[in-house]
């Protein structure tokens, strides 16, 4: 960890994560990596509370971070840092929209390049694709001495574009990331550029860490705006489409977000819907349907073969608390299928029935 003052890159990280600063951490998700900022903070004021320090550990993306329930929740513990000059520019302001791309991310060259490329009718322009990939390679090479910061910012830019892009128009973005992984950046020593012994861009080093930082939305939040709900759907669609292209025999494949699929399906079909409002249950089921629409084969195959996850991250929902489930399996897949079939036949909302029928058809034919 460096002893240098806060860098622009660290400020970008904190601005990004700081949007939901009072609500961290969320068990089931890894902590945010504001390590440099916190180290600087510790020299300016008494140590921050443990819940904030816990956000700053470097975690492996394959590690589970679940609470005893296995479900994410929002912490209500918060503390003011306004007395610390260096933190004034990093803390969220009340008048800043909760959703959207902040100025720090919008100013990134990678964000500008990618958002320009993805602004299409949903089809991929091959020439523009190669040009964008080359630009990302060049930017990574120029950032060799600060590759960790560069990757963190770049992945935030990628997910920012995903949040703004409807599912039906995400193909260029997914194609871009797949093509990017087929390239390797050469370091100044003539060897492949690496971070944590992972190759840039083949292994997408720390991509999973950034994803987990972002997966902090709560479908039970009745105050969520329409824009926020749309961003949840878009992020879920993006992760699902990546999972559909992942090598599922390799649990470390950076495209494999199957654990997130399980969380979505669990929230929709394994909790007592009577205890949830119609609105929150509707959001949860919509996210589950998005996964079943974009990654039906992956979800089916992992359920048939069996895929357990570390710790309690894959445990069952409250309706099935007595089941010894730690991940995806055939019995659990059957529960999801039965729930969807029931919704498709009994839901009072016509749109819900239609979505459920589409999801049920995906499950029956895969």
Predicted segments with their positions:
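Compositionally biased, intrinsically disordered low-complexity segments enriched in Pro/Arg/Gln/His
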Residues: 50-53, 60
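N-terminal mitochondrial targeting presequences
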Residues: 41, 61, 65, 74-82, ...
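Eukaryote-skewed repeat-based solenoidal scaffolds used as protein-protein interaction platforms
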Residues: 94-327
């Amino acid at each position: 960890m460096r002893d240098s003052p806060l860098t622009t890159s660290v400020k970008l990280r904190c601005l990004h994560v700081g949007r939901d600063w009072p609500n961290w951490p969320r068990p089931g998700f890894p902590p945010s990596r504001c390590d440099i900022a916190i180290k600087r903070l510790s020299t300016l004021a008494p140590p921050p509370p443990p819940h904030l320090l816990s956000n700053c550990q470097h975690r492996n993306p394959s590690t589970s971070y679940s609470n005893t329930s296995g479900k994410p929740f929002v912490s209500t513990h918060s503390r003011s840092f306004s007395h610390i000059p260096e933190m004034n520019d990093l803390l969220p302001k009340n008048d800043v929209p909760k959703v959207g791309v902040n100025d720090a991310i919008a100013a990134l060259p990678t964000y500008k390049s990618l958002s320009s490329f993805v602004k299409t009718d949903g089809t991929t322009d091959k020439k523009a694709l190669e040009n964008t990939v080359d630009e990302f390679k060049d930017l990574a090479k120029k950032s060799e001495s600060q590759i960790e910061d560069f990757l963190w910012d770049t992945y935030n830019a990628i997910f920012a574009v995903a949040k703004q892009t409807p599912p039906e128009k995400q193909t260029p973005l997914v194609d871009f990331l797949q093509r990017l992984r087929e390239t390797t950046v050469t370091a100044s020593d003539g060897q492949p550029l690496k971070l944590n012994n992972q190759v840039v861009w083949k292994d997408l080093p720390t991509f999973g860490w950034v994803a987990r930082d972002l997966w902090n939305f709560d479908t039970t939040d009745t105050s969520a705006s329409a824009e926020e709900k749309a961003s949840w759907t878009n992020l879920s669609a993006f992760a699902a489409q990546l999972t559909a292209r992942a090598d599922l025999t390799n649990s470390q494949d950076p495209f494999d977000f199957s654990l997130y699929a399980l969380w979505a399906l669990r929230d929709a079909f394994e909790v007592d819907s009577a205890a949830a409002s119609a609105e929150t249950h509707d959001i949860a089921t919509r996210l589950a349907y998005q996964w079943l629409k974009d990654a039906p084969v992956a979800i089916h195959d992992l359920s048939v073969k069996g895929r357990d996850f570390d710790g309690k991250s894959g445990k069952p929902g409250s309706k099935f608390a007595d089941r010894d489930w730690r991940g995806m399996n055939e019995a659990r897949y059957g529960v999801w299928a039965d729930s969807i079939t029931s919704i498709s036949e009994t839901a009072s909302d016509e749109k819900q029935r239609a979505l459920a029928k589409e999801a049920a058809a995906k499950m029956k034919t895969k």
